[in-house]
């Protein structure tokens, strides 16, 4: 009988991305495609709570069913490719098994063309394969003049699990040698 611990297993960072385009947001605004036509140059007014209580399904089933961790980090990075600043971004990540809050993230301001990242420890947590991100709020700030409207410009949100140390897990581990036992064998080759 041999014991092998999960500490001997290496696991690559898990990155799950979500993209929200200007076009998808403009389509939600009454008369949005008329006020902000694709390819136009126009000033964007302040749009408080343009996104609120929007859900993002974070499906990690390609990587694991569940993980109970003794170490690890959860990071959220938001890349703002909109032509104007965004602010008051409030995100909650919810465990869909017991509906507990895994993490809350708040970003007061993300300038146009920049990105921000925040990270928390998830040591001691059990993370299921299905987590829901709730974008509680996102404000679009007024532009400082006319800006180009390109419906393909997007906010990109990357959720990253890194430096994972497992207590237990049901996961798809990368192919690797976890345990090797070498034994010396003595073979008598003398003829009978």
What does each model-found stretch correspond to?
Residues 1-192:
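Extracellular/secretory-pathway and virion-surface proteins
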């Amino acid at each position: 009988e041999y014991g092998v611990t999960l500490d001997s297993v290496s696991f690559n960072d898990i990155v799950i991305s979500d993209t929200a385009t200007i076009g998808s947001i403009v389509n939600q605004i009454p008369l949005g495609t008329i006020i902000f036509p694709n390819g136009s140059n126009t000033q964007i007014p302040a749009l408080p709570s343009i996104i609120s209580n929007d859900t993002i399904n974070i499906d990690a089933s390609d990587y694991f069913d569940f993980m109970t961790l003794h170490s690890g980090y959860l990071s959220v990075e938001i890349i703002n490719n909109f032509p104007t600043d965004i602010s008051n971004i409030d995100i909650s990540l919810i465990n869909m098994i017991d509906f507990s809050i895994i993490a809350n993230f708040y970003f007061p301001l993300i300038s146009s063309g920049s990105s921000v990242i925040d990270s928390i420890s998830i040591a001691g947590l059990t993370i299921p394969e299905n987590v829901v991100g709730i974008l509680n709020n996102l404000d679009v700030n007024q532009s400082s003049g006319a800006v180009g409207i390109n419906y393909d410009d997007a906010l990109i949100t990357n959720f990253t699990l890194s430096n994972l140390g497992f207590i237990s897990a049901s996961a798809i581990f990368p192919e690797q040698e976890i345990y090797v036992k070498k034994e010396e064998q003595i073979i008598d080759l003398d003829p009978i």
